[in-house]
């Protein structure tokens, strides 16, 4: 089952902050989605307490992993990139669709590389793909390539749903 929310506008778009807690990409629990959402809720609550909507986890090597509620996609030099599974991220359904159908690249990248990117997006089964408005102090404008990818993803999802 895939759900889809409307893309929020302006200041309702997600904003991200770096979490102090580090994820261990070598943990045997890495990439296992469980019914325990404690760590995910921690990221969201700590971020909200600081005026952001979600927190970004890094692994022990300083690589971006994911947020408390979604996988991450960045756009850098007209190339969409999501953290590789080696980072310790969950192999989310929407992430897998983006890789399979849109050629999104899987690579390791740092917090600084994310800040230097042209755009940042969150992807999840609930939101599909949504642009991020701010990562700590850096504001991100809407990006035409990102808007096209969002539209194309929504179209492919709708084409697979039988009513």
Residue ranges and their predicted role:
Residues 1-163:
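Helix-start/capping segments and mature chain N-termini
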